[in-house]
A protein has these predicted regions:
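A shared catalytic/ligand-binding motif for oxyanion handling
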Residues: 1-217, 233, 795
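Conserved, non-catalytic sequence blocks in retroelement Pol enzymes and Pol-derived host proteins
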Residues: 20-28, 56-61, 88-90, 145-150, ...
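Basic/polar low-complexity segments
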Residues: 57-58, 65-66, 71-73, 92, ...
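Short linear motifs embedded in intrinsically disordered, charge-biased segments
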Residues: 61-64, 80, 91-94, 98-103, ...
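Surface-exposed loop/turn segments and immediately adjacent short secondary-structure elements
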Residues: 105, 190, 198, 246-398, ...
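Active-site-proximal segment of RNA-dependent polymerases
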Residues: 176, 300-328, 376, 381-385, ...
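Inter-domain linker/hinge segments that demarcate the starts of reverse transcriptase
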Residues: 192, 322-334, 362-371, 421-422, ...
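Conserved catalytic palm subdomain of right-hand nucleotidyl-transferase polymerases, strongest
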Residues: 333, 337-347, 386, 396-406, ...
């Protein structure tokens, strides 16, 4: 086989190196295809040598490269050289050899935290064991020297008793097997015994017993897999697509794949140094992450405190700074989630057991009261164990990773108490556009607000410019001194502010990379992974947006509304309640609406400078870096322009900010998982949903959907809870034409045929209709699923309070005359079609929707 780098494609370079003989022939192409399918690399083509030929043709005397050394790509880093050498035997082939760098790895000694995580805490549910455990903790606590702090003594006692009294939990088997291990293990033993007897003496009796044992085992395995899949997806099936987003569904895909089929763990990636070269040792990798997080958490904040002079000082909220009582502490401890503990490794189950014993609870209460009165946090509460998680993008760049802090479980008790005290204050602020980290609100609220606002203006012949802001490391850049001032301005009692200062005074971040542990000081930002983090961030964002609206005035998008059941819009001169829509916010994902490019160009630099006064940085474009903040131009209908190709000479160039910085003007933008386009059509969003659902279905096709071991009922649960949730995310707001409906129907039918293991040829030959296949799986048509989701959301918005933006926009209109031409297919007309399909009268839907139970009964009948 010949090989030449001149004819290599980019895909082929992933399997073949750049060195070889002559040109690649048909055999070489088949060889490259084999390498790609099996994820292999030909080492002998990766190193430059004087000779590559391993065989000489007997007639032409031409050299051919036939012999190779193949390796898995994940282990290619251990090879240092590969090439051709002279064979020591009488053969027409030459030998190939390689050099391997091997390094023995000593078994890593587990830490105290890891040993505590390996224990089985289920025994603490027994009252007798719980009392004995607490009694042992009390004895250990009293036996320690009194010069140590109360929390240190209690934590040490809990750790010692936990390690001494609790057993190690058995290592779980992957996924479905662990749930049915007790039932399947005896059947495996029976099968093995029958097989041994058959090998010893093969008779009709032993063969029948072996056949029966195998059949019983196969049926049990099939049932166990179906039960495990149903239990895994039941919770997801009951949840709404507005909560959790696409990430929750992809996590479920990974869980199902790992539970049904063993997956391989990836190795540590080499990181890029500042000079662009890759790290070669674990120590260099750890040093890169240390420098990255030192720069992120150790930078001194830069802000302008004078900007807070525009923030109105609220009256101090009373009756929220008193010392926590027994009921409040017990309630906060009971709400602890059984997630990753902090550096000590003490799990929430232990503290839930501690509060059930009178004397140990008294010690825990004394620790909390001492902190509340002295305002000095225990040293253990100031250490956060940082878990480094990868984001999208180049994973050799440390900037594409984020850290989540695992905090002490006892600290979370006081954090929950403070959170419950601060939440009513935050909810009393004027933050109607904000939907992030707020109860009863989600992504769909923001997407609905922006989409309906843009479609209303386009329907009335108006252009809109939308600035989508992306903040750089928003959580990790909050200036704490400014945050404390903001809390005081919003009426938070001084006692609670001092307690928060104490909890953030000396935060230590500890993380391990490639078995190298580093600890750095964190002097900026709120803690990611802390229940207080999102709440404090909302206070901070409220101050930013409130001061922005007070300092800078600009033309706003005005709408008019009446709180009734008219959805199709009114005449442009109809009277109604006026309201404006300046922006829509989901945490730090902000969409700011402008009526013209001139207003946008004038306000954008001021907005960026305003965020900079609060220590925030907006992600803008540079000559060598793309921008994550973008501008979407939403045009009026095409027939309103003389030249629709240029929108009558509209300026669609990038918005220049000076010093080479810019913001691009784009045709489409992905906002909170939903795609917004220039013409306000939903084609791009539907296509993106079909692509995402196709990837999810393909990931589970082999191990689940086409498996004969999985029942139809289990397939239905997974398909409805996972695939349809991904496919129909955001469908509550879609304005679907018949062409888009057909595309969704085609995808739905293709998935149904795959789950029934029926091809299109079978359906034609045997005249099997899609309706019959849907009945086998007990599934509905895609039209029914979309109609139910749209009407469910319509009823939810109709029941909202009148101050909510989605409720106002539902029946709103723009005071501008509609342009001449065919009427557009609006959201109101789409919902009216859904009401007709559900056989709900158009003049009575609003009154029916006020009763949630009756409304859901009608749309699900």
């Amino acid at each position: 086989m010949g090989h030449g780098c001149s004819q290599n494609t980019n895909e082929r370079r992933n399997t073949l190196g750049q060195f070889g003989l002559a040109h690649i022939n048909d055999s070489g192409r088949r060889f490259a295809s084999y390498l790609a399918i099996n994820n292999l690399l030909a080492l002998t083509t990766c190193y430059q040598k004087n000779s590559y030929g391993t065989w000489i043709h007997p007639r032409s005397k031409l050299h051919h490269q036939l012999d190779h050394i193949l390796t898995d790509k994940s282990t290619s880093q251990f090879f240092t050289d590969a090439g051709v050498t002279q064979s020591l035997i009488d053969s027409d082939h030459r030998a190939v050899q390689c050099k391997v760098r091997l390094q023995s790895r000593l078994k890593k000694r587990s830490t105290t935290r890891q040993r505590l995580l390996q224990l089985d805490y289920s025994g603490l549910g027994c009252e007798r064991k719980k009392d004995a455990f607490c009694q042992d903790v009390l004895e250990r606590y009293n036996a320690q020297p009194e010069n140590r702090s109360k929390y240190t003594r209690l934590a040490t006692a809990v750790e010692c008793v936990t390690r001494a009294s609790l057993p190690r939990k058995t290592k779980p088997q992957p996924g479905w097997f662990s749930a049915a291990q007790n039932e399947i293990t005896p059947l495996i033993q029976q099968r093995n015994d029958a097989m041994s007897k058959t090998f010893e003496k093969c008779t009709r009796s032993t063969t029948n017993k072996l056949r029966t044992a195998r059949k019983s085992l196969k049926n049990a395995v099939s049932k166990a897999k179906s039960n495990w899949i149903s239990s895994t997806c039941n919770t997801l099936n009951e949840s709404s697509s507005a909560h959790g987003g696409t990430k929750m569904y992809w996590d479920t895909v990974g869980k199902l794949r790992n539970g049904l089929k063993k997956s391989q763990s990836c190795s540590e990636r080499p990181m890029k140094k500042p000079d662009g070269t890759l790290c070669k040792t674990p120590e260099e990798n750890a040093e890169v992450f240390k420098n990255h997080f030192q720069k992120l958490y150790g930078r001194q904040p830069v802000f302008d405190p004078s900007v807070l002079e525009h923030l109105h000082r609220h009256a101090i909220v009373s009756n929220c700074d008193h010392t926590p009582d027994d009921e409040e502490i017990i309630k906060a401890t009971s709400r602890l989630k059984e997630r990753g503990p902090g550096d000590s490794g003490i799990c929430p189950q232990v503290w839930k057991a501690v509060i059930r014993h009178e004397q140990t609870f008294a010690i825990l209460k004394a620790i909390i009261v001492d902190f509340w009165e002295s305002e000095i946090a225990p040293a253990e509460w100031e250490v956060g164990l940082l878990k480094i998680l990868a984001k999208k993008g180049d994973l050799s760049d440390p900037g594409n990773y984020r850290g989540i802090m695992l905090l002490e479980t006892a600290y979370k008790i006081i954090a929950i108490i403070l959170h419950d005290r601060l939440r009513p204050i935050q909810e009393g602020l004027d933050m109607e556009p904000q939907c992030g980290f707020c109860s009863g609100r989600g992504c769909t609220d923001c997407v609905f607000t922006v989409k309906i606002a843009l479609k209303k203006r386009r329907e009335h012949g108006l252009e809109t410019w939308v600035l989508f802001l992306d903040l750089v490391k928003a959580f990790d850049r909050v200036p704490r001194e400014m945050l404390w001032t903001i809390l005081e301005k919003f009426g938070v009692p001084a006692k609670l502010v001092r307690l928060l200062k104490s909890l953030h005074a000396n935060v230590q971040v500890k993380f391990t990379v490639n078995e190298v542990t580093n600890t750095i000081q964190c002097v900026i930002g709120v803690k990611q992974g802390d229940i207080l983090g999102p709440l404090l961030f909302l206070f901070f964002l409220a101050a930013v947006m409130i001061t922005w609206k007070k300092v800078h005035e600009r033309p706003l998008c005005l709408y008019y509304t009446k709180y009734d059941d008219v959805l199709s819009g009114r005449r442009y001169n109809t009277k109604g309640e006026e309201f404006s829509l300046p922006d829509s916010e989901y945490a730090d994902d902000t969409a700011v609406l402008f009526v013209s490019r001139e207003s946008l160009v004038e306000s954008t630099p001021l907005l960026i400078a305003h965020f900079a006064r609060f220590g925030m940085e907006i992600h803008v474009g540079l000559p060598d870096k793309l921008s994550k903040s973008e501008i979407l131009f939403v045009a009026a209908p095409d027939h309103t322009y003389e030249d629709s190709s240029t929108y009558d000479g509209a300026d669609l160039t990038n918005v220049e900010l000076g010093d080479g910085r810019y913001l691009p003007v784009v045709d489409i933008f992905k906002y909170l998982g939903s795609i917004l386009s220039r013409d306000c059509r939903d084609d791009a969003d539907v296509h993106a949903r079909i692509d995402a659902a196709s990837h999810a279905f393909g990931a589970l096709r082999e191990c689940l959907f086409t498996s004969t071991e999985v029942s139809y009922s289990a397939k239905k649960v997974v398909y409805e809870g996972l695939i349809l949730s991904i496919l129909l995310y955001g469908s509550e707001i879609w304005c679907l034409t018949e062409m888009l409906f057909n595309k969704l129907r085609v995808f739905h039918a293709r998935c149904v045929r795959a789950m029934c293991r029926v091809t299109r040829l079978h359906t034609r030959m045997h005249r099997i209709t899609t309706t019959e296949l849907l009945q086998r799986l007990n599934l509905n048509t895609i039209d029914q699923y979309i109609t139910r989701r749209q009407l469910r959301w319509l009823g939810h918005v109709a029941r909202m309070e009148r101050e909510r933006l989605p409720r106002k926009l539902l029946t709103s209109w723009v005071r501008n005359k509609r342009p001449r031409g065919a009427p557009q297919f609006t959201y109101g007309r789409g919902v009216m079609k859904a009401l007709k399909k559900a056989e709900i009268k158009k003049d009575s839907w609003y009154d029916i929707a006020q009763d949630r139970v009756v409304w859901r009964t009608l749309i699900y009948r």
